[in-house]
């Protein structure tokens, strides 16, 4: 009888033994990400890859007429550029954003926390579509993830009003729901950054509609200008940001650009370099090294532009 009992107990222990499955250390599933605030925060960092890099600020105007170059890009050569050679028609960032919004629904996370991160996602969706509209004009509006057989993969362009109205809705949601109001690093999107982007986008859209009368959208110009004004006033009155004057009129402007860290009293969102993280700027290499190859070189016109700026801003 005892043998039977021992055998039965042993069998129960074997059947109820611990699982050998381990939690992956290098990857997570969807439920793991979306059921905690930390998971939402970690996912949201992927959106920042859309923003300009450290080097974009001094490299993006390489073909402007303030500099001399040894060669020209095809996009300014007559007959050398075409739709096939164009860039920017990538939708992977949008899919990443829409996937997040669709799945940020787990009630284990407080609703206000979820809305904060959805607001952040919609901020970046507005930024994505702003960049697309500036580059291409009319584009299709897509606010969900698409399968491989989805008809929207072959969708035509939506009207400018449709797309930009959705962009404004995204910006309004972001301004209302992003909870962060201060960031000591100057590298994260805050509520005030959302208002600033809203002001910039609305100003662009109002001006575009005003001067492109062929669109037939001049009736909405004042509305978009007013949206820009209200957003800018919010930043000026409520954000706490202001022009940096901490080192006097002679040194503050220079200090703003040579500081190791963003001067967050003025700078709202920065692309940061950090030697400890091996993230370094390359401006000196770009401008002074012969090993970088053919590149933009300043001419007297640019130098005079800077000198005129100093003349107009000098307190004397």
Question: Where do the model's predicted regions map?
Answer:
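Alpha-solenoid helical repeat scaffolds
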Residues: 131, 135-138, 144, 177, ...
